[in-house]
């Protein structure tokens, strides 16, 4: 039987609520929204840039440029789902940012970003973005699932799953480390896996 859905903490704020708070005249919710926006989407941008061949430093620069660009446009930005998914809009922003950085590098040379597209731009570009997006969804799902068990005083259940499934420790090794029996490890694996799938599906439905 599936466990009860967690009460949505700040980490699970919907994209719509984040966009709404970004336009708030109150600095407190606006700053919170920017932090949530950064924590949610910066890893996607960084992962995509790295998959395109950027170094860590280059990828971080792409992130900063994209976030700053969105910040500048936010007062005028109105997201219309009828015009396409936000993930597509964000990918376009990232692509334009990387293109602009390459152009600036070719003119002045201070930023070595000409290697940002080592991978063939015609091959698997959309798939690279999808991989980065799915990675972000899974990361958030893991965080939310961990919070779910922690709030219920069952963090050990999640830790058993984490050691056994995410970190690759055997069931006996996990049991010994956490001071539980092997059967409890297997039970935790089943329950947390089910919960994780549930949370991930919710996030996928929300993000589109």
Each model region followed by its residue ranges:
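Intrinsic, short, N-terminal disordered tails of RNA polymerase sigma-factor systems
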Residues: 1-208
């Amino acid at each position: 039987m599936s466990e009860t859905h967690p009460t949505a903490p700040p980490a699970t704020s919907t994209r719509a609520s984040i966009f709404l708070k970004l336009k708030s005249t109150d600095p407190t919710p606006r700053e919170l929204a920017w932090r949530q926006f950064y924590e949610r989407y910066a890893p996607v941008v960084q992962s995509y840039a790295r998959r395109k061949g950027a170094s860590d430093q280059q990828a971080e620069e792409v992130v900063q440029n994209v976030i700053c660009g969105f910040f500048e446009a936010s007062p005028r930005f109105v997201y219309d789902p009828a015009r396409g998914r936000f993930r597509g809009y964000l990918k376009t922003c990232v692509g334009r940012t990387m293109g602009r950085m390459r152009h600036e590098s070719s003119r002045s040379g201070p930023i070595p970003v000409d290697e940002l597209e080592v991978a063939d731009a015609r091959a698997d570009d959309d798939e690279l973005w999808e991989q980065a997006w799915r990675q972000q969804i899974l990361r958030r799902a893991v965080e939310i699932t961990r919070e779910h068990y922690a709030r219920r005083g069952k963090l050990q259940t999640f830790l058993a799953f984490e050691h056994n499934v995410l970190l690759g420790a055997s069931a006996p090794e996990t049991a010994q480390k956490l001071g539980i029996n092997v059967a409890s490890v297997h039970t935790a694996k089943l329950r947390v896996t089910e919960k994780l799938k549930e949370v991930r599906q919710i996030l996928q439905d929300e993000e589109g």
